Swiss-Prot record:
<dbReference type="GO" id="GO:0006749">
    <property type="term" value="P:glutathione metabolic process"/>
</dbReference>
<dbReference type="GO" id="GO:0060052">
    <property type="term" value="P:neurofilament cytoskeleton organization"/>
</dbReference>
<dbReference type="GO" id="GO:0046716">
    <property type="term" value="P:muscle cell cellular homeostasis"/>
</dbReference>
<protein>
    <recommendedName>
        <fullName>Superoxide dismutase [Cu-Zn]</fullName>
        <ecNumber>1.15.1.1</ecNumber>
    </recommendedName>
</protein>
<feature type="disulfide bond">
    <location>
        <begin position="56"/>
        <end position="145"/>
    </location>
</feature>
<dbReference type="GO" id="GO:0043410">
    <property type="term" value="P:positive regulation of MAPK cascade"/>
</dbReference>
<keyword id="KW-0479">Metal-binding</keyword>
<dbReference type="GO" id="GO:0030346">
    <property type="term" value="F:protein phosphatase 2B binding"/>
</dbReference>
<dbReference type="GO" id="GO:0060047">
    <property type="term" value="P:heart contraction"/>
</dbReference>
<feature type="modified residue" description="N6-succinyllysine">
    <location>
        <position position="90"/>
    </location>
</feature>
<feature type="binding site">
    <location>
        <position position="62"/>
    </location>
    <ligand>
        <name>Cu cation</name>
    </ligand>
</feature>
<dbReference type="GO" id="GO:0004784">
    <property type="term" value="F:superoxide dismutase activity"/>
</dbReference>
<feature type="binding site">
    <location>
        <position position="82"/>
    </location>
    <ligand>
        <name>Zn(2+)</name>
    </ligand>
</feature>
<feature type="modified residue" description="Phosphoserine">
    <location>
        <position position="106"/>
    </location>
</feature>
<keyword id="KW-0564">Palmitate</keyword>
<feature type="modified residue" description="N6-acetyllysine; alternate">
    <location>
        <position position="121"/>
    </location>
</feature>
<dbReference type="GO" id="GO:0043524">
    <property type="term" value="P:negative regulation of neuron apoptotic process"/>
</dbReference>
Length: 152
């Protein structure tokens, strides 16, 4: 059983990063940094497929094995892959430090082999008042992505 995973984020533009995942008890700790972002919040999600053959678009929708509506990471109603937002500073750097109780590195909610995506816009956490908000959080285009793999 995997206890650690890693993801290297790359896109067509300047956005890149490395994200580490570590199982700790009933949670997964997500840490790392992303550079090349515009200042402010950016949606940060695990998407269903580990397919990046067509860039980040072939990663499919948010990882949602429970068939729920989109929400924030602290909401009862959320996709498993909904990790909310990362916040970039004025230099375009986002430091990631998330503890999530729903994602896993093993079992039916495992994120291994799926794609991590950082988005262009803030995730409205399903509170945007339109249908797209309940699917994607209106987070916009996919700036960078990478497949999550088992780490040592």
């Amino acid at each position: 059983m995997a206890t650690k995973a890693v993801c290297v984020l790359k896109g067509d533009g300047p956005v890149q990063g490395t994200i580490h995942f570590e199982a700790k008890g009933d949670t997964v700790v997500v840490t790392g940094s992303i550079t090349g972002l515009t200042e402010g919040d950016h949606g940060f999600h695990v998407h269903q497929f580990g397919d990046n053959t067509q860039g980040c678009t072939s990663a499919g929708p948010h990882f949602n094995p429970l068939s729920k509506k989109h929400g924030g990471p602290k909401d009862e109603e959320r996709h498993v892959g909904d990790l909310g937002n990362v916040t970039a500073d004025k230099n375009g750097v986002a430091i990631v430090d998330i503890v999530d109780p729903l994602i896993s590195l093993s079992g039916e909610y495992s994120i291994i082999g799926r794609t991590m995506v950082v988005h262009e816009k803030p995730d409205d956490l399903g509170r945007g008042g339109n249908e797209e908000s309940t699917k994607t959080g209106n987070a916009g285009s996919r700036l960078a992505c990478g497949v999550i793999g088992i780490a040592k």
